[in-house]
Regions:
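Feature captures the catalytic ectodomains and active-site-proximal regions of enzymes
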Residues: 1-191
Length: 191
């Protein structure tokens, strides 16, 4: 896959930090980078993997959300990075179990951690974007991904976003470039 966001950001010297637990580490690295195993620029990219617990997800639905957030907030407040991404796997992985009580706990765990992330974002006057690539925790009777629309939440941004039916995940990369003051390349469509 060509023209990934990380490739574009590295061209502009943007320092990146990616973190998740083992269950979704590949999603913030390999898949995020267009199925590429190696970094585009070793000096600009930092990857952190929090080891996942080896227990059924419904037995520990909070997973490693707190540990991810500890490192995430540290990275945000450090001032060492211009763009930070994470993946909290709780809604997806616990949602696959089909256990509604466990899924609720998993999602509530992420809610609690996002409150901590917001505190760190506020300290540095940053912008927080929250989205997902699919639904899963939104339909208790299914253990597969749903077709439900996913949110795209912008926190603390002094901007106006377009609204429309033709906008979606394909617009996220250009929007990130815009927030960073970069002109998105012709392959990235802006929200």
């Amino acid at each position: 896959i060509k023209y990934t966001l990380t490739e574009e950001l590295c061209k502009h010297g943007i320092r990146e930090y990616a973190i998740s637990e083992t269950q979704k580490y590949g999603h913030v690295t390999y898949f995020w980078n267009g199925n590429r195993s190696e970094k585009f620029d070793e000096s600009l990219e930092t990857y952190v993997e929090i080891p996942s617990d080896v227990v059924p997800f419904e037995q520990r639905p909070w997973m490693k959300a707190a540990e991810i957030t500890d490192k995430l907030c540290e990275a945000i407040e450090s001032g060492n990075y211009d763009f930070i991404r994470t993946n909290y796997p709780n809604g997806d992985m616990v949602g696959h179990t089909g256990s509604l009580p466990a899924t609720i706990i998993g999602v509530e765990s992420v809610d609690l951690e996002l409150a901590r992330v917001i505190e760190s974002v506020n300290k540095v006057n940053g912008i927080l974007l929250v989205t997902a690539d699919h639904g899963n925790a939104d339909d208790e009777s299914k253990t597969s991904h749903t077709l439900a629309p996913v949110p795209f939440i912008v926190y603390n941004a002094e901007c106006e976003l377009k609204e429309g039916e033709d906008l979606g995940l394909s617009n996220v990369a250009a929007t990130v470039c815009d927030f960073l003051g970069l002109e998105p390349n012709e392959h990235l469509s802006l929200i």
